[in-house]
A protein has these predicted regions:
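Conserved small/polar residues in nucleotide/adenosyl-binding loops
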Residues: 150-155
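Metallocofactor- and cofactor-centric catalytic cores in central/energy metabolism, strongly enriched
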Residues: 63, 69
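A generic, well-ordered mixed alpha/beta core segment in the N-terminal half of proteins
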Residues: 76-146
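Polybasic, low-complexity association/targeting segments
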Residues: 1-13
């Protein structure tokens, strides 16, 4: 007799989109690639004391509303222009809530805020949001907590 003993509590499996497919679906333009690269380069120069501006990384704890995030980014862009000689403003764009043990886990994991866990949708929303923020000319910083965030552009060391 054969007994089913594996995966007894799994209701369904949903395959994650590959990084390649997400990048093909939401490609990065040369203009946005230049903004990302130059943001990373500027950050590196400030950290290496080659630029005396202060770095400000500001934004919400975790993004839950992409439209509100873009409105916030537009306001930061105005401040970035006003204080460009004194400050480098980077928008904090976190998609997960790693220290939350109960409740909503973040935009990537549950983009509809309803417990449906449409992770593929969340990945696309995240990448698209970072793209649009960079397209405004504003650098974006995120926290990499999970391999699911591998498809999102963000400022980091331009040499890597």
């Amino acid at each position: 007799m054969t007994y089913e003993t594996d995966d007894l509590r799994i209701e369904s499996l949903n395959e994650l989109s590959s990084p390649k497919s997400v990048r093909e679906e939401i490609p990065i333009s040369d203009e946005v690639a230049s903004i990302v690269y130059n943001s990373r380069l500027a950050l590196s120069k400030i950290l290496d004391f080659e630029d005396d501006r202060l770095i400000l990384i500001v934004g919400p704890c975790s993004i839950h509303d992409p439209i509100a995030a873009l409105e916030y980014a537009a306001k930061l862009k105005v401040l970035q222009e006003k204080y460009k000689n004194e400050l480098m403003i980077i928008m904090r764009v976190y998609f997960e809530k790693p220290r939350t043990t109960v409740g909503w886990k973040g935009l990537i994991n549950d983009p509809d805020l309803d417990g449906s866990f449409k992770i593929n949708k969340g990945i696309r929303i995240g990448r698209d949001l970072l793209y649009k923020i960079n397209e405004m000319g504003l650098g974006a910083g995120t926290e990499y907590l999970d391999c699911l965030l591998y498809t999102s552009p963000s400022p980091r060391d331009p040499t890597k």
